[in-house]
Regions:
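Active-site SXXK
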Residues: 50-57, 76, 101-134, 138, ...
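Acidic/histidine-rich, surface-exposed loop or edge segments in extracytoplasmic proteins
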Residues: 30-40
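Bacterial N-terminal signal peptides that target proteins for export
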Residues: 2-12
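C-terminal motif of bacterial Sec signal peptides marking the signal peptidase cleavage site
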Residues: 22-23
Length: 448
């Protein structure tokens, strides 16, 4: 295997060359768009766009990332595209425009759109009880109290959780990716996220008490996988079939799916984990239990489990850009109407109370001085948070477990996507804040 620093520097220079061979590109047409950038796009400063791109490549040079691609689209045009580092470490293959990425929780907004397609068709009301479509949940219980000795007191539901609460992570379900409370501990013990199919997941979740009474708190949860089950039960289609028919095909998202076909396998980027012994990033899989919760990383059709609306998709920069542009356009792209603007606005409207706001990573419950809320399958940046950060008020965002991130800012007519394939270093190590750093450079570059 070639020297890692040589590989990374070569890949970084390759990415720089690709970026500089640029022409202004509009996100339009169903063909794979050329993502190379032209900072002469109106509304951005040329030198500051160059600084943004340099800083994104610096993540690789400094060893904070093995590979990265970032995209800034402003006024429907590519203002910046950067790629650096390796897609395939063993063979020294660099990140390319058509590299495929495990987007994990960036699947959640797509599932939210699927839900709202059905909502527009009149299939459900946001205030319908979840049990209307998942009757297995009619007799859920709730954790009332617990202690460190393992004693748990349960209580009945005061009322059924609603679809709106399911889409805003306030229904009370656990997830198992963190938390020492009884609900999350049972999610891990019963390996909920490793369920072979959605019915098995539902059957297991039905045996686990809620973390809190519906509507009383925000907690990141399995709720988007449950949304996927609702989409299947209402539509009579598998989640993958529904996505393909109602979202991917109309938008020209040709590479987004729950598995990677054999003919595309070489385009799937390595995913990296921080090795506890060697103290560096290594391509997975390796024997580290911390990553087992996420299951198969090859995304081969024959080894994939359930179609997870909460974290199961693989995509490309171009595909996810088309999804974001559709959202920014108010629900349509190139004549394909996916949702109404009214519905897009509803999804991007905060539904949390002041006591339920979350931090900008989407991982903490409780209040924050910076108003970051939650809509329907999106985090929402508003008020003081937007004033401090530079985001337009009402910008919405999310990210994925392997460090991918995006945000959509309708006030400034832009979106930004970052594609990385690595799981963060465990504490006490410090991880780069990709989102915050990119945000600072993006808003510094705006001139309009």
């Amino acid at each position: 295997m070639r020297d890692i620093l040589t590989l990374l520097k070569t890949a970084t220079l390759t990415g720089l060359l690709v970026v500089n061979l640029s022409a202004c590109t509009k996100i339009t047409g169903s063909a794979f768009p050329d993502l190379t950038s032209n900072p002469a796009v109106t509304g951005v400063d040329v030198e500051k766009i160059a600084a943004l791109e340099s800083r994104m490549r610096q993540f690789v040079v400094e060893g904070d990332s093995m590979g990265i691609a970032t995209l800034l689209v402003h006024d429907g045009k590519v203002a910046s595209y950067t790629q650096a580092g390796v897609r395939d470490l063993l063979n020294g293959e660099p990140i390319t425009q058509d590299s495929m990425y495990r987007i994990y929780s960036m699947s959640k907004p797509i599932t939210g759109v699927a839900m709202m397609i059905l909502h527009e068709q009149g299939a459900f009301s946001l205030d319908d009880p979840v049990s209307k479509f998942i009757p297995e949940f009619e007799n859920l219980e709730v954790v009332k109290s617990y202690d460190l000795e393992g004693n748990v007191e349960l209580e009945p539901l005061q009322r059924q959780p609603t679809i709106r609460e399911l889409m805003s992570h306030t229904a009370g379900f656990g997830y198992g990716i963190s938390g020492a409370d009884p609900s999350n501990m049972q999610f891990r013990k019963k390996a909920v996220l490793a369920s072979p199919d959605l019915q098995s997941l539902i059957d297991t979740v039905a045996t686990i008490p809620l973390m809190h009474q519906p509507g009383t708190a925000w907690a990141y949860s399995v709720s988007v996988d449950l949304q996927g089950a609702i989409v299947e039960r209402i539509s009579g289609m598998s989640l993958g079939e529904f996505f393909q028919s109602k979202i991917f095909k109309p938008l020209g998202m040709v590479d987004t799916a729950f598995y990677v076909p054999a003919e595309k396998a070489e385009r799937l980027a390595d995913v990296f984990g921080y090795h506890p012994v060697t103290k560096n990033f290594q391509a997975l899989p390796f024997a580290e239990p911390a990553f087992n919760i996420l299951g198969d990383i090859s995304y081969r059709k024959e080894t994939r489990g359930m179609e997870s609306g909460g974290g199961g998709l693989v995509s490309t920069m171009a595909d996810y850009a088309r999804f974001c542009q559709m959202m920014l356009n108010g629900g349509q792209l190139d004549g394909a109407r996916i949702l109404s603007k009214k519905t897009i606005d509803l999804m991007a409207k905060n539904v949390l109370t002041d006591s339920q706001t979350i931090d900008s990573t989407g991982n903490l419950t409780g209040t924050t001085s910076q108003r970051v809320g939650f809509g329907l399958n999106f985090g929402i940046i508003m008020g003081e948070a937007s004033e401090i950060s530079g985001y337009g008020d009402g910008s919405y965002f999310w990210g994925g477990a392997a460090s991918t991130w995006f945000w959509i800012d309708s006030k400034n007519d832009l979106f930004f996507i970052g594609m990385v394939q690595q799981f963060p270093k465990p504490p006490p190590a410090v991880n780069p804040d990709f989102r915050k750093i990119s945000q600072q450079f993006v808003y510094d570059a705006l001139t309009d």
